[in-house]
Regions:
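Short, solvent-exposed secondary-structure boundary motifs
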Residues: 91-92, 368, 382
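C-type cytochrome heme c attachment motif
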Residues: 363-370
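Active-site anion-handling motifs in enzyme catalytic cores
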Residues: 1-350
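A short local structural element in Rossmann-fold oxidoreductases
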Residues: 151, 372, 377
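Ferredoxin-like iron-sulfur electron-transfer modules
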Residues: 341-363, 375-384
Length: 384
């Protein structure tokens, strides 16, 4: 194994995410915060406690590239990832943050599941990105769109690996879970944006099952008139709420992840931009690889409300993807070439593809996003 430490890099624009309120007076500008000050403060404290107990964070906090350059860092290898750390649009100046490319050190660098979060690199930034990427001994990405970006910039084919939350087994997450305070057997709704597309599913599930609705609040709009809102959940309670749910409705990627991890019947909604360009969507990418594309609302082939999920098949696919991702990580840490293992298929047993007439293609991308083997790719041509 390897000893790991998280560099406490403090990005200024994130300084209010879990900022400790100093009192009701300082929160008075936000009526919602003031009204729910107690539960929100409890949530903040639970996040802090969970971090202290479960994460090995550097003793010093760094707030700039220059501070990191001047520090005498004890690391042998730097690992960057995951999430949208390579998306220039999330930073105030619209540029890449060199820290997330390890530009402060000449030590060996590894990338695990970073995301660009955008369909293409802004004009004039390709050379900068090429310089950053060429400093890595091992590269991987979280979505197929990122794979294409790296190929276009560097000429390299890099693996698409699982989000880190999927590298652990269900039992690992269950061990970290605590009672979420909602009992057992309910419809859990976890929304990080307006629940518009989910609302009809939530109503119908509540009517047909008679189960109560519990809202793990990520937005200020109630998903159901009788929903019980929980604002105080920290990471451990968050896990407990997924563990103890009967159904899950979500528009969050990680809400989808933990529905899969705890094997809960679920429906997930994606943003209109993701629906229009599923190749850029981490939710489409994950669920298509697991054979769960029909759990996405609005695609035209959404599963029936009470349709069962073949969790044995999902578990087999997830186990295979997890092994490939862990193999990449081990090779990267040991500085070995990464050669993905593939099950051998005899030529005579491999069926030839049946190609449809291209004039019948509407460009909806449903076949590509729903293929359980992730065997279909689509590219634009002069006809669309």
């Amino acid at each position: 194994g390897s000893e790991c430490e998280i560099i406490d890099y403090y990005v200024n624009q994130d300084n209010t995410l879990f900022q400790r309120p100093t009192g009701l007076g300082s929160a008075a500008h936000d009526a919602h915060t003031a009204l729910h000050y107690g539960p929100l403060k409890a949530r903040y404290e639970r996040f802090e406690a969970f971090s202290r107990e479960n994460l090995n964070i550097s003793g010093r906090r760094y707030q700039s590239l220059e501070e990191l350059r001047q520090a005498e860092l004890p690391y042998d290898v730097l690992l960057s990832g995951s999430d949208q750390i390579w998306n220039p649009k999330i930073f105030p100046d619209g540029r890449f943050d060199p820290v997330f490319f390890g530009a402060f050190s000449h030590k060996r660098k590894i990338a695990y599941a970073p995301s660009f979060g955008i369909p293409r690199i802004p004009d004039g930034m390709e050379e900068e990105l090429r310089t950053y990427l060429e400093s890595f001994s091992h590269l991987s990405v979280r979505e197929r769109q990122g794979q294409g970006i790296v190929r276009d910039i560097t000429g390299k084919d890099v693996p698409v690996v699982l989000d880190p939350t999927l590298l652990l087994e269900r039992t690992d997450w269950a061990a970290a879970a605590r009672d979420g305070g909602a009992g057992r057997g309910y419809i859990l709704c976890y929304c990080i944006s307006r629940p518009d597309a989910l609302a009809p599913y939530i109503r119908r599930l509540a009517e047909e099952t008679g189960l109560p609705v519990v809202q793990l609040c990520g937005v200020r709009q109630k998903v159901h008139p009788k929903a019980r809102c929980i604002l105080s959940a920290g990471p451990a309670e968050f896990l407990g709420l997924f563990r103890d749910a009967a159904y899950v409705c979500t528009n969050s990627f990680h809400g989808t992840v933990f529905s899969v991890q705890f094997q809960k019947p679920f429906f997930t909604a994606v943003a209109p931009a993701e629906m229009a360009a599923p190749e850029s969507s981490r939710t489409f990418s994950l669920l298509s690889r697991l054979g769960l594309g029909e759990r996405i609302i609005g695609k035209g082939d959404t599963a029936d409300l009470t349709a069962p999920i073949d969790w044995a098949a999902v578990g087999e696919r997830l186990g295979r993807e997890r092994k490939l991702s862990l193999d990449y990580l081990r090779c990267a840490l040991e500085d070995r070439p990464h050669t993905p293992e593939e099950a051998p298929v005899k030529a005579e047993e491999r069926p030839l593809p049946h190609l449809a007439d291209h004039t019948h293609c509407t460009g909806c991308t449903a076949c590509a996003s729903g293929c359980p083997k992730d065997a279909i790719t689509m590219e634009r041509d002069r006809e669309g």
